[in-house]
């Protein structure tokens, strides 16, 4: 993979060398999610480069030791989505953030819903701004009535505002092409990076096998949100077919439910092979390398990905990977199996083939 810069700190050093204080905007800071993982690594990289970082977020799931966090959400309703929307289009909220914004040299925005605040800072306080494009989400991919309405209305406005920020950085050439097709702005590419000191082939996964009493059973792993776009229902259906050929196989799903309705749906789907599917929930990032190393195969049936860090993490740990040939997968995957989109029968055959090789 070729990038314009190897990481975010290199970009800032080369093009924003007077920036000593950076604000990072993210809707939900959750290190169990892809965007949250990227943001966390950006914070670490910038700190190592001697740059002060302030995190601006609507929701904060994970703590950041000794780092400044500014909550940009309102609390007018009991609905988080509505509170975010109210804050995002409320000029009084933007004004209330001015004292914090004026201290910064550069803003990096990771989601469209925060672009209105960044654009305000760009125009009023003359602060440099970067929109970090992970993917261009389609309105129909959003879950829930409020999210769908937002997707077809305000989201489109915020996405347009993102194109008015000073610089566009995409996490893959695929995401760059999708964005430039929409807004005729190319921007640059900085591929997401992983920590090779954490994710490498020397990691021992035996404690994960011991934890779930798997011994030498064939183990398939998925890491990510339990969301429709991640294709968990398809993965379970494919695994059900795989288990008919390899009856001692186990599927471990690591990650939090994105939507309770969908989570209940996949739990029902898993009933037929209930003893062979483990929903591990959220696990600490420091434990993830052991999960990858314990697995014989990393599998994802995701249908939209602007990057997909988990494939890169699995391969770094020496675990074979399989995925549909969608989004940026062909950029990320170095030595795995790409299956034509929606071809679940071939996906099953390749899973069986890969698991058989590992035995």
From Swiss-Prot:
It comes from the Archaea. Its EC number is 2.4.1.-. Disruption phenotype: Impaired formation of the tetrasaccharide present at 'Asn-532' of S-layer glycoprotein Csg. No effect on 'Asn-47' and 'Asn-117' glycosylation of S-layer glycoprotein Csg. Pathway: Protein modification; protein glycosylation; Cell surface structure biogenesis; S-layer biogenesis. One of its GO terms (biological process) is S-layer organization. It is an enzyme of class 2 (transferase). SUPFAM superfamilies: UDP-Glycosyltransferase/glycogen phosphorylase (SSF53756). InterPro entries: Glyco_trans_1, Glyco_trans_4-like_N, Glycosyltransferase_grp1. Keywords: Glycosyltransferase, Transferase. Hexosyltransferase involved in N-glycan biosynthetic pathway that takes place under low-salt conditions (1.75 M instead of 3.4 M). Participates in the formation of the tetrasaccharide present at 'Asn-532' of S-layer glycoprotein Csg, consisting of a sulfated hexose, 2 hexoses and rhamnose. Involved in the addition of sugar 3 to the disaccharide-charged dolichol phosphate in the tetrasaccharide. This is Low-salt glycan biosynthesis hexosyltransferase Agl9. The gene is agl9.
């Amino acid at each position: 993979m070729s990038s314009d810069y190897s990481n975010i700190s290199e970009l800032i050093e080369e093009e924003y060398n007077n920036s000593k204080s950076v604000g990072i905007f993210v809707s939900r800071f959750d290190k169990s999610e892809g965007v949250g993982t990227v943001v966390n690594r950006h914070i670490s990289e910038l700190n190592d480069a001697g740059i002060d970082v302030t995190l601006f977020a609507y929701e904060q799931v994970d703590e950041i030791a000794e780092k400044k966090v500014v909550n940009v959400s309102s609390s007018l309703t009991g609905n988080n989505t509505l509170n975010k929307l109210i804050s995002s289009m409320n000029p009084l909220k933007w004004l209330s953030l001015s004292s914090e914004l004026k201290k910064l040299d550069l803003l990096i925005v990771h989601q469209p819903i925060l672009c209105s605040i960044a654009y305000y800072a760009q125009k009023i306080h003359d602060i440099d701004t970067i929109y970090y494009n992970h993917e261009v989400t389609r309105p129909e991919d959003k879950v829930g009535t409020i999210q769908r309405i937002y997707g077809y209305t305000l989201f489109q406005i915020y996405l347009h505002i993102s194109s008015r920020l000073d610089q566009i950085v995409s996490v893959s050439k695929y995401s760059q092409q999708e964005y430039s097709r929409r807004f005729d702005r190319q921007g640059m590419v900085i591929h997401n990076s992983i920590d090779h000191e954490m994710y490498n082939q020397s990691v021992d996964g035996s404690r994960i096998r011991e934890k779930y009493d798997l011994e030498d059973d064939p183990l398939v792993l998925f890491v990510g949100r339990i969301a429709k776009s991640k294709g968990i229902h398809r993965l379970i259906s494919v695994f059900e077919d795989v288990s008919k050929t390899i009856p001692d196989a186990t599927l471990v799903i690591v990650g939090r439910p994105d939507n309770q309705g969908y989570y209940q749906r996949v739990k029902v789907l898993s009933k037929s092979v209930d003893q062979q599917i483990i929903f591990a929930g959220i696990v600490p990032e420091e434990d993830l390398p052991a999960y990858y190393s314990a697995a014989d195969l990393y599998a994802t049936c995701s249908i939209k990905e602007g990057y997909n860090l988990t494939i890169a993490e699995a391969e770094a740990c020496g675990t074979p990977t399989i995925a549909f040939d969608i989004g940026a997968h062909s950029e990320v995957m170095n030595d795995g199996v790409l299956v034509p989109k929606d071809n679940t029968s071939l996906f099953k055959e390749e899973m069986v083939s890969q698991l058989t090789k590992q035995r």
